[in-house]
Amino acid sequence: MAFIAALGILMAGICPTVLCFSDDTWGIDILLHKNQESGTPDDSLTLASINTDFAFSLYKKMALKNPDKNIVFSPLSISAALALVSLGAKGNTLEEILEGLKFNLTETSEADIHQGFGHLLQRLSQPEDQDQINIGNAMFIEKDLQILAEFHEKTRALYQTEAFTADFQQPTEATKLINDYVSNQTQGMIKKLISELDDRTLMVLVNYIYFKGKWKISFDPQDTFESEFYLDEKRSVKVPMMKMKFLTTRHFRDEELSCSVLELKYTGNASALFILPDQGRMQQVEASLQPETLRKWWKSLKTRKIGELYLPKFSISTDYNLKDILPELGIKEIFSKQADLSGITGTKDLSVSQVVHKAVLDVAETGTEAAAATGFIFGFRSRRLQTMTVQFNRPFLMVISHTGVQTTLFMAKVTNPK
């Protein structure tokens, strides 16, 4: 099972010549020292809750624009990229970005926000044998553009950002340079993040995240069969349906929201929640998506014995120009002539021309060979549990979280898995 996302922020403007100098709005030395220390559980929970709030707000805007379409995106990829841009923003531009990300600036300082993201990215970048997560940022800078040393150092130290020069006067070559980089970082899953560059492009910021998870208990490919997936009450399509018998996992029936919630774990620190609304109740569930809803689901999950589980095998991809969506979350000024990104170059000649996000979700039977033997053991061996059948044969939601840092990595809505 793989989930890959990439985001590109294209900046355009008049190419200034700027000498590199320092900005002392908050001390980089102090911030970097704090970032090297371990974050507290409270810090982690606060950032996780805020990121979830942003994720659901963004999801609702996407769903409103395309109610019957598949949705796949990484809220973490988008929020991390916007937070990175905010390092160079000032005044109202800065406030719009951070408030659009759902931060309360009277309660959380700018320095604490960046420290939180830095710690989160650091934790996710730690090598783990069982998780395959590759997350990072890159800046592609016009060869004649000089950016401030302070901005460059903060992006490197806090957001693990690589910096490259590019000749945007040669747009074909520059586009290939960026797309080849993203393709390499996402194992070839996203080959064309950028389709074309504006002739005034001065900088492209890229965030990518690649996740390949193995089910703790894998589906047997020999059990996969062709079955109906009901798009609505009148239409259906044939899809490959995976099947598993006698699975012990956590489940919750939410009568208030008329949906069922099932957890499937990956090896390592990742876990997926599958949310199956009752027929005709998808919009009700979507409208109720809040951080509190997700917390309720996690706390309410109880171990159950699933007699039969049916889950479609699918691969879906989406791409978005978030310039059409972010203003609805209050992030407007970065796209206008009033944008103040002077913390990047020292002048106000820079604005964002495009925010492109692409994501790919691939769900299949794959799991580790030993997982099927150990995954059934959850400490309930002496208790008899009532079995049930769960069929994901109609539109459903999927939330992938990293339990180690308690944050939402990806969200998806599967309306048509074919």
From Swiss-Prot:
Additional remark text: The single human alpha1-antichymotrypsin gene (SERPINA3) is represented by a cluster of 14 individual murine paralogs.
Name of the molecule in the record: Serine protease inhibitor A3M
UniProt cross-references to PROSITE patterns, sorted A to Z: SERPIN (PS00284)
Keyword Signal belongs to the record: yes
Domain commentary: The reactive center loop (RCL) extends out from the body of the protein and directs binding to the target protease. The protease cleaves the serpin at the reactive site within the RCL, establishing a covalent linkage between the serpin reactive site and the protease. The resulting inactive serpin-protease complex is highly stable. Variability within the reactive center loop (RCL) sequences of Serpina3 paralogs may determine target protease specificity.
Keywords: Glycoprotein, Protease inhibitor, Secreted, Serine protease inhibitor, Signal
Family: Belongs to the serpin family.
Annotated region (RCL), positions in chain: 367-392
Protein's GO biological process: response to cytokine; response to peptide hormone
Domain of life of the source: Eukaryota
Residues bearing attached sugar chains per UniProt: N104, N184, N269
InterPro entries attached to this UniProt entry: Serpin_CS (IPR023795), Serpin_dom (IPR023796), Serpin_fam (IPR000215), Serpin_sf (IPR036186), Serpin_sf_1 (IPR042178), Serpin_sf_2 (IPR042185)
One cellular-component annotation, GO: extracellular space
